[in-house]
Amino acid sequence: MEGADLLTAGVLFLFAAVAAVPLAARLGIGAVLGYLLAGIAIGPWGLGFISDVDEILHFSELGVVFLMFIIGLELNPSRLWQLRRSIFGVGAAQVLLSAAVLAGLLMLADFLWQAAVVGGIGLAMSSTAMALQLMREKGMNRSESGQLGFSVLLFQDLAVIPALALVPLLAGSADEHFDWFKVAMKVLAFAVMLIGGRYLLRPVFRFIAASGVREVFTAATLLLVLSAALFMDALGLSMALGTFIAGVLLAESEYRHELENAIDPFKGLLLGLFFISVGMSLNLGVLYTHLLWVAASVVILVVIKMLTLYLLARLYGIRSSERMQFASVLSQGGEFAFVLFSTASSQRLFQGDQMALLLVTVTLSMMTTPLLMKGIDKWLSRRLNGPEENDEKPWVEDDKPQVVVVGFGRFGQVIARLLMANKMRITVLERDIGAVNLMRKYGYKVYYGDATQVELLRSAGAEAAESIVITCNEPEDTMKLVALCQQHFPHLHILARARGRVEAHELLQAGVTQFSRETFSSALELGRKTLVSLGMHPHQAQRAQLHFRRLDMRMLRELIPEHSDMVQISRAREARRELEEIFQREMQQERRQLDGWDEFE
């Protein structure tokens, strides 16, 4: 693709994303389906703006690559070892069972047995990009079903290597073309990457971080991710697997959070590009000429994978309320099918339109998943939020609540319990099914649902409530909810949880002044106790704590992100000097009796 064409394609991709995703969100079908529909619109079977789909699809895999690197950063080797049973037990069972059933059905559809085996393996795989994105949107990444889903996806990525090696064997060209020496060299190169990364990455990043230039650190992070992807691609292995391993190797390093922040903006944009590319690859000509075959294939594929996953989730001990989510989020075909089927086609395993039919089936199955998840969400809402005969009497009645509490994790539970102990009428919204089930057993009236949906907030009593307390784990959800309340429920008094200074700044800029940084108060309290343990009088330590709190809050308001780094550094130094002067005046002016004030009074 020429430079000018690449620039034009980039503009078209950005325009499609900007136009389609907000429209999809307004229609309530989700960002992923919006990207897919945008791809169909600008692709060769839509308006025809872009025709070189294969090249763009390969480039767009970088979105999955960046996503897997961030996931690797969140898992250390010890955590992976803990997941070994679910990875090699449930993951292997899912791939083998689904592949066997699907291969048998393809043989009944006049596929050669070799092509049926490849087709079954390819269709058994799920879309890592789509599944992880949907799990994050639905809050599944912290639940037991989400962890199991990730384990299955990880095994599927590991299965890429033997699956690709199997294709030439099935094609009957093993003796003529299959070079075992090359395979051994690839394994050796992979081992060198693991060992080298284990001992070299941290010293290299330590050297780069010492420069103090953030842009260089970001560039080094991009270099690491892209190099790992290219290295694995050169070996004929999964690019996503290579970057996942790089992330795991850095998961226990002191640069983990900085690496994640550097990559995150690129990940989101490139994931969108990937979904648009998948939409562009949909062959509407094949769909039109084989409509019944494709429609039946999509239904059969989704049903078989859902049944297999549901059965495995039940055997693994996943709660019944979470099994449907787990089964549906992995029910689609995946991006690996494009690679595997192309390799099989080059070995002439497929006949006629067989490859095109399989690819159309995979693409359409990916489009069904957001709709399927939306339908299951509604079903779960009716099931979990409806009245039950064996429900215990709730602590408070939820008719016309005074307060809506969003999130019932450790932070939200403390707030909700305090409000209920003071006889306040509250409604609690939580999108973790496991937490909803557990809390309802203890008599809490917790409702399942995504609070970023206006209709759910309205049915929860937001129009009648006086306040809303937002305790979401994800900062993006918090800011989205703030904007939603300001637009649709301007009367609500908004109180929010801030995970740190960055989110506190965002809340202030959005006009939210009542917020609590989750670790700030507890850290101040422990600091006060430390001062007392060092011999400071309890009253002085208490006043020092109050002075520090007031000054820090003032600095938080003054040091907004619009200021340059030098201005912020200068102002922070002034604040530190000001704090020291306040404490010195306190020491000079207050000469109190050591037994004149008791911190436990």
From Swiss-Prot:
Record's keyword terms, sorted: Antiport, Cell inner membrane, Cell membrane, Ion transport, Membrane, Potassium, Potassium transport, Transmembrane, Transmembrane helix, Transport
GO biological process, one term: proton transmembrane transport
Localization per Swiss-Prot or TrEMBL: Cell inner membrane
CC annotations in GO: plasma membrane
Molecular function terms, GO-annotated: glutathione-regulated potassium exporter activity
SUPFAM superfamilies reported in the protein's UniProt record: NAD(P)-binding Rossmann-fold domains (SSF51735)
Ranges for domain RCK N-terminal: 400-519
Domain of life: Bacteria
Biological role: Pore-forming subunit of a potassium efflux system that confers protection against electrophiles. Catalyzes K(+)/H(+) antiport.
Matches recorded under HAMAP family: K_H_efflux_KefB
Family: Belongs to the monovalent cation:proton antiporter 2 (CPA2) transporter (TC 2.A.37) family. KefB subfamily.
Subunit structure: Interacts with the regulatory subunit KefG.
Protein name (database record): Glutathione-regulated potassium-efflux system protein KefB
Source organism per UniProt: Salmonella typhi
Source lineage: Bacteria, Pseudomonadati, Pseudomonadota, Gammaproteobacteria, Enterobacterales
